[in-house]
């Protein structure tokens, strides 16, 4: 049970038919709406380590919409792969630091292995160095947006206020980013 990934592969390879599949709840879905935005959130039960079934349920429950944004955890783990599977565009968010660049390279390799289109957003773009930009240039990866560090963004989030509502200039940055995503056919990003 603890090692199960929910893929059914063990049943396929067990010639004796000794393995059976059963339903084990791993989490739940919460649905919500704010003005024109519908939200589906998957919550993993405490003590459960396997989130891909919850992610699949979120994707299945997501409304048919012109734009579907799936926010994944960072990294290249199974939950990330399940989150990006089938995406029209994978938007990788990074920071221009050595750690950020290392993680970006791993994520780019994963997305390329899945043969999915990708682009990059550089967060806190005014810190660090230019190596992230150089990597993207050398790999022909579009940088759709660079967002400089702004303490007011963190302060707004700490109050539960989205940056785009607290700061009009952030709203313009995100609106411009959305236009770029949509122009690339990113209906399922």
Label the model's feature ranges:
Residues 5, 46-53, 102, 165, ...:
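Conserved active-site and cofactor/substrate-binding residues in soluble primary-metabolism enzymes
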Residues 1, 5, 9-25:
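Iron-sulfur cluster-binding cysteine motifs and their immediate structural context
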Residues 77-98, 104:
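Inter-motif core of Ras-like GTPase G domains
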Residues 110-189:
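C-terminal lobe/tail of nucleotide-utilizing enzymes
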Residues 64-68, 89, 117:
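Loop/turn-to-beta-strand initiation segments
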Residues 41-46, 50, 57-80:
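Switch II (G3) loop of P-loop NTPases
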Residues 6, 25-38:
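Conserved Radical SAM active-site core
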């Amino acid at each position: 049970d603890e090692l199960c990934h929910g893929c059914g592969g063990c049943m396929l390879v067990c010639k004796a038919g000794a393995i059976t599949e059963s339903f084990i709840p791993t989490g739940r879905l919460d649905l919500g709406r704010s003005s024109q935005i519908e939200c589906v959130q998957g919550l993993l039960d405490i003590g459960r380590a396997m989130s891909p079934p919850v992610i699949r349920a979120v994707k299945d429950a997501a409304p048919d919409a012109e734009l579907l944004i799936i926010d994944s955890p960072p990294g290249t783990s199974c939950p990330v792969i399940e989150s990006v599977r089938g995406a029209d565009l994978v938007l990788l968010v990074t920071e221009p630091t050595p750690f950020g660049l290392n993680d970006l390279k791993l994520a780019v390799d994963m997305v390329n292995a899945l043969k999915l289109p990708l682009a990059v957003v550089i967060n806190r773009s005014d810190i660090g160095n230019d190596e992230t930009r150089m990597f993207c240039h050398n790999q022909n990866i579009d940088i759709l947006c660079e967002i400089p560090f702004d303490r007011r963004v963190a302060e707004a989030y700490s109050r539960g206020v989205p940056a785009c509502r607290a700061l009009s200039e952030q709203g313009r940055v995100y609106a411009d980013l959305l236009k770029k995503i949509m122009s690339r056919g990113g209906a399922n990003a």
